[in-house]
Structures are given as C-alpha cells and as structure tokens.
C-alpha cells in the first residue's frame, strides 16, 4: 500500500486518537497530545460525514471536558486548527477554547 505524506499524517493522527480513546476508556486522564488528537479526529471525521465548518466549530467544544484531561491541559489549548476535507474542498476549522 502506498500512501502520500498527507495520507500518512492522517493515518497517524487517527491511530493517536484511537490510542487516546482506549486510555480514556481505562479511566486515564488525557495529556495535551492525546486531547488534540481526539479533537482533531472528531473534526476530520465530521468533515468526512458532511458536517459544516460551523457545526464542527461548535461540536469540537463538546468532545472533551475538564474531567477528561490532566490539570493544566485546558489552559494550554486556546485553539485547535485543522485543515479538513469537505465535499466542496479543504477548509480550515478553528475550535476556540476546545475544553471549556
């Protein structure tokens, strides 16, 4: 199987999000990279499902809560920005304060 660098990046991100979800299911609090991976995966998959940028900007704030992450992680995440592929092209999705 031959993957472009872009496809390799998406695959790695998807795996990182899956690993973070397994850790979360075991009751572990997520660190910064794990939280970003889950939020980013939510946005990429939402775009693939046909959701709008506006919908993802809102729903991206509901993916994780303060109880899901280690102390200090919400303060480290002011914004999460993801270039996602929508049916009508690639767009930048910004989720402000993704962990309220």
From Swiss-Prot:
Pathway entry: Nitrogen metabolism; urea degradation; CO(2) and NH(3) from urea (urease route): step 1/1
UniProt cross-references to Pfam families, sorted A to Z: Urease_gamma
Catalytic reactions of this protein: urea + 2 H2O + H(+) = hydrogencarbonate + 2 NH4(+)
Any one GO biological process: urea catabolic process
Compartments in which it is found: Cytoplasm
Enzyme class, first EC level, given as a word: hydrolase
One GO CC term, this protein: cytoplasm
Gene Ontology molecular function: nickel cation binding; urease activity
Family: Belongs to the urease gamma subunit family.
Self-association state and partner proteins as the record states: Heterotrimer of UreA (gamma), UreB (beta) and UreC (alpha) subunits. Three heterotrimers associate to form the active enzyme.
Protein name: Urease subunit gamma
Taxonomic source organism: Mycolicibacterium gilvum (strain PYR-GCK)
Gene for this chain: ureA
């Amino acid at each position: 199987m031959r993957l472009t660098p872009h496809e390799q990046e998406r695959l790695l991100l998807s795996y990182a999000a899956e690993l973070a979800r397994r850790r979360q299911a075991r009751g572990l609090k997520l660190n910064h990279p794990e939280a970003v991976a889950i939020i980013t995966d939510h946005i990429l998959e939402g775009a693939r499902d046909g959701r709008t940028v506006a919908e993802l900007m809102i729903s991206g704030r509901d993916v994780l809560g303060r109880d899901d992450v280690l102390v200090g992680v919400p303060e480290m995440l002011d914004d999460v920005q993801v270039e996602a592929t929508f049916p009508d092209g690639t767009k930048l999705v910004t989720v402000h304060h993704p962990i309220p």
